[in-house]
Design a protein with these regions (language model features):
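Conserved catalytic cores of very large enzyme subunits
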Residues: 87, 91, 98-483, 504-505, ...
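Short, hydrophobic beta-strand segments
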Residues: 3, 45-50, 291-292, 496-501, ...
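Metallocofactor- and cofactor-centric catalytic cores in central/energy metabolism, strongly enriched
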Residues: 28, 271, 275, 500, ...
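Long insertion/accessory domains within large nucleic-acid-processing enzymes
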Residues: 666-712
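Charged, amphipathic alpha-helical regulatory modules used
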Residues: 1-109, 696-702
Length: 712
């Protein structure tokens, strides 16, 4: 029986005694030992030891050779063999993937790593430290934690195991809705400080900033505060009462007016401080927190004041140049009878939101009725687009805050279509195989959290961010079961998938092809529904943002299948179900095209439109918002808001494959411009932190959704 040797990279090869003999002879030559018969004898002894086994590790063989040589007459030969083995190990390590990736970081030559995340400034030490940890975490996960077929599928580009630099090496999850209300009203401990309920809005926002930083350092995805205007409203009341008490003490004639005026100023200043805090702090992950504020449904004067303060601060901008703030992402809820139409009590806040969106791109909007229809209840997305389903506690109450997403595995749909070579039957068969593999990968995320104790992340599990107050040695896995947490299957490239399968006509122009695209997503939804039924975990379908993935999958597929027209020829894949960015349509038709997908992929979605400068035509933007209200749950506005600090130009910079340039004076100095683009669901500043090549090309090709002159 010939045993198999398990090599360092995990592959198996047949055992060959000749290789042992050759290695010993090389060591003998280096040691000045001229005894070929002895070398052959040692090789035969080792072979006889190994032949009794079906599988042996390469390190076991080398150790056996060393032991045999050490017991023989030529100690210098044993020493030479050990030194030879050590030198080979060093050379192998230098050539190894781990060493190459570390060198690429240290020497700043690995552009794929350095530009993978547009929110990470890879030039600074804290981020480099995080990237280094990520390289090691990825390597360990691939070598020791994940099933080999999952690793191979990820390496090939069949699937993408998101955030390998954090999970499964660390028992971390993706994104969440912080239970801010519970933390602020019940108090909590952070570090060495016991935090009591705040007594003013300024203190409440200061504490909120610290909570955001702590939570964001313990998870790897987005951090969302759901309905922040309603959560923080009681602290506006507390400030008002303090100011009114001051007015009474000083016998100010109009105590109510004085208190209201001082409260308005305090609230504005509090949210200004919060915005600056978010944009200046760095988490332990080496980046600004991916944080989202959901607001707009509060009806009290305190909630309205918070809504206005958030929007007015965003409009004002950051610093002396009034730069557009990238974070927090703002998501404004619109509800008929509240703020949707003229005459609604909060319609004035909607007008302020329109102005803000035209100048700062945010807020995106949540259309209340559609969100409830598609996801079962109203809530703000976790991060940029991940939505929770309905979950009720033991009292039958719907709970959103404190819940989370455990992670994502995305399918490379265009690759399946390329492998199928135009055969639809083969495509469906391959898709089912990939779905089984994706499920296996997702289950590793769940398994990694089993047995984990609350003490690994006190802010999440012991101090209330996850809506629970566990003890240090309590298991955390229970709070993720029965649909309380979601875990998501992602997908990319419906547009390229249809092109690869059917070619010819554009997806947008064919009702038949549109139906084919929808059918693919329907099959994905059927799969996650089945997994949810079988496991009890909250499997959901997620329309992957694809900041890095649009480039990675396309690059791997180009290497495998070549440049395929309509598929790999652009250098990127289209995000999830989105319309091809080069297709010229009006915003209403784009909404109609994308509207069938969110109800299917209700675990994660967003629709958006590209517009010219509409700061002086807010009615046109409102028309699109109002149209979206009846058709899609979640809508974003992309408008040109770039600024040149050399010549004063405001508008849209020219986007090239190498960067962004002022069209008026040619300035492209990153320190003298402000360039803002929607990366996926979040905004980014590509002038300061460049996109990867695929995302840069996609941004360059985007067209405005104008129609027949209705917009602009």
């Amino acid at each position: 029986m010939t045993p198999h040797v398990m090599k360092r990279d995990g592959c198996k090869v047949p055992f060959k005694s000749e290789r042992i003999k050759e290695a010993i002879l090389r060591a003998a030559k280096a040691a000045g030992v001229d005894d070929a018969d002895y070398c052959a004898t040692v090789a035969e002894v080792i072979s006889s030891q190994m032949n009794a086994r079906s599988q042996v590790d390469i390190n076991e063989i080398q150790t056996a050779v060393e032991n045999q040589l050490m017991s023989g007459p030529y100690k210098q030969l044993a020493r030479a063999y050990i030194e030879y083995r050590h030198d080979r190990d060093i050379q192998r390590e230098k050539r190894g993937r781990l060493n190459q990736e570390i060198r690429g970081l240290v020497e700043q030559t690995n552009s794929a790593l350095l530009n993978e995340n547009a929110n990470k400034d890879s030039k600074v030490i804290p981020t480099q430290r995080d990237l280094l940890a990520g390289i090691v975490a990825k390597h360990y996960a691939r070598q020791h934690l994940l099933p080999r077929d999952v690793v191979q599928a990820h390496e090939r580009g069949d699937i993408h195991y998101h955030d390998l630099d954090y999970s499964p090496f660390f028992p971390m999850f993706n994104c969440m809705l912080i239970d801010l209300k519970g933390m602020l009203t019940q108090g909590f401990k952070m570090g060495n400080a016991e935090i009591e309920p705040p007594k003013s809005i300024s203190t409440a926002t200061a504490v909120t900033a610290q909570i955001i930083a702590q939570v964001a350092s313990h998870i790897y995805g987005g951090t969302t505060i759901n309905r922040i205007d309603e959560v923080l409203a009681p602290f506006v009341t507390a400030s008002f009462n303090k100011h009114r008490q001051t007015a009474a003490e000083w016998q100010i004639p109009d105590a109510e007016g004085y208190a209201r005026s001082r409260t308005e100023k305090e609230c504005y200043d509090a949210f200004q401080s919060l915005e600056y805090e978010v944009n200046t702090l760095h988490t332990a992950n080496g980046q600004t927190p991916f944080v989202t504020f959901g607001f707009g449904l509060g009806t009290s004067w305190e909630s309205r004041l918070i809504q206005a303060s958030i929007l007015r601060n965003r409009i004002a901008g950051l610093g002396k140049n009034r730069k557009t703030a990238v974070f927090p992402k703002l998501v404004f809820a619109i509800r008929d009878g509240l703020n949707h139409k003229f005459g609604d009590p909060n319609y004035d806040i909607k007008q302020l939101a329109l102005e803000c969106a035209s100048k700062r791109m945010y807020p995106d909007i949540l259309n209340y009725d559609q969100v409830v229809k598609v996801t079962g209840s109203f809530k703000t997305p976790m991060g940029c687009r991940s939505f929770l389903g309905v979950w009720e506690n033991e009292n039958g109450e719907q709970i959103h805050d404190g819940r989370n997403n455990l992670g994502v595995i995305s399918l490379n749909l265009p690759r399946i279509a390329l492998e199928a070579k135009g055969d639809e039957t083969a495509f469906w068969k391959l898709l089912d195989e990939r779905l089984a593999l994706a499920r296996k990968a997702l289950m590793t995320r769940i398994a990694r959290l089993e047995g984990v104790k609350a003490r690994v992340a006190p802010i999440l599990y012991m101090e209330g961010a996850c809506g629970v107050r566990l003890k240090a040695d309590d298991d955390v896995a229970e709070i993720f079961k029965n649909g309380r947490a979601s875990i998501s299957l992602g997908y990319i490239g419906i547009h390229e998938t249809i092109n690869a399968l059917f070619g010819g006509e554009h997806l947008y122009d064919s009702e038949q092809l549109r139906a084919k695209g929808i059918a693919i997503v329907e099959r994905l939804r059927q799969a996650v529904d089945q997994w949810k039924e079988e496991t009890g975990y909250g499997f959901s379908l997620y329309s992957t943002p694809s900041e890095n993935l649009c480039d990675r999958f396309c690059r791997l597929d180009t290497a495998e299948f070549g440049v395929v027209p309509g598929v790999t020829d652009k250098g990127y894949y289209t995000n999830s179900f989105h319309l091809d960015v080069e297709k010229k349509v009006n915003p209403y038709d784009k909404i109609d095209f994308e509207a069938p997908y969110p109800p299917l992929a209700n675990g994660g979605f967003i629709c958006y439109g590209e517009y010219p400068n509409i700061q002086h035509n807010l009615k046109a933007l409102e028309d699109v918002w109002d149209y979206s209200y009846q058709h899609v749950p979640y809508y974003g506005t992309n408008t040109p808001i770039d600024e040149c600090y050399e010549c004063g130009f405001t508008g849209e910079f020219e986007c090239t494959s190498k960067g962004f340039t002022c069209p008026k004076c040619g300035n492209h100095d990153a320190s003298r411009v402000s360039v803002t683009r929607r990366v996926c669901g979040y905004l980014g500043s590509p002038d300061a932190r460049p996109f990867n090549a695929g995302k840069q090309e996609e941004v360059k090709r985007r067209v405005k959704h104008l129609g027949n002159g209705q917009i602009g």
